[in-house]
Amino acid sequence: NPALATGRGEIIEPQKPFAALKGKGLLLIHPGFGVSTPWAYQALAASGDYGNEGAAAAVLEALSAGRLDGLANSLEAPVFSKYTVLPVIKEFLADHGALVALMSGSGSTMFALTENRAAAEALRAQYHDHFGQAGWSATVSL
């Protein structure tokens, strides 16, 4: 079940299932390398580009109303500047049918939301045809 984590992740608020995610497919892609979580957060803090007040509430409202707008990850900017293949992967996913493509957490795993699991499987095959078999990938139904 979905939850909202706040603080340093220690405050967990269970949420009702989101209408926007019902029946969607999810593709996870790990490109074969990791990103240091402490480094990612330090780079974000140094940039000063974080902490959009009300953003989480707006995303929860959109998802509950059946919309996917507003999904974002502020850690993408510093991580993408160092690991330049990640924005290429994100763009590929968006250009090949993902409803939403984002980095998960501090990276390096990327994810794509699709209309259904079959679309996620097709996108997975296209990804591996284009980028090869390095890393791992998985699909699930939401």
Where do the language-model regions lie?
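Glycine-rich GHKL/ HATPase_c ATP-binding element in histidine kinases
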Residues: 108
